[in-house]
């Protein structure tokens, strides 16, 4: 039976089963829980394994510290060694597989999924939150698509996820401007289900 702490293979990702809820915590607070080459594969595996675990009834994803997830670790990408040479088709195929096994897997999980945002969610981090069934955020949280600020197009299904929730016109606005959207506005746009005061968010 899956109870207590679950070994994720890295201290960058924590997982604990509490009363049949798998609480998965992105644990890189020093980088606002940005996704990188260690945490991301571990997150994929936890989503898959806990999604298939008969002793788990729901998944909750949250972030350590004051952020949910800042998206991809852009600084880490810049400091990485030489990339493996790939054709454009190979790069597209790799990205599709990464998306399918992360946000795609979240959408497909046949159990309730909840994103609990203690603070900002941006880029791929926002996509992870949007892929969950329910989003609960602290009052100081905000979201941003972020991609336009670093000259990238949206990935991890964020275009589809946003369009499904807010419609084509608003989704395009959020993607093109990469504006910060505060928690109250997110609730008004139905991007989140509930806003919780900061002081009681972790209760």
Residues of each region from the PLM?
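Conserved CoA-thioester-binding segment of acyl-CoA-metabolizing enzymes
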Residues: 1-64
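Glycine- (often His-adjacent) and acidic-residue-rich active-site loop
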Residues: 7, 48, 63-105, 121, ...
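Hydrophobic/aromatic residues within transmembrane alpha-helices
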Residues: 24, 61, 73, 128-129, ...
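Histidine-centered beta-alpha loop that forms part of the nucleotide-sugar donor binding/catalytic region
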Residues: 27, 72, 118
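Amphipathic, non-transmembrane alpha-helical scaffold segments
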Residues: 36, 40, 92-96, 175
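Crotonase-fold acyl-CoA enzyme core
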Residues: 37, 104-203
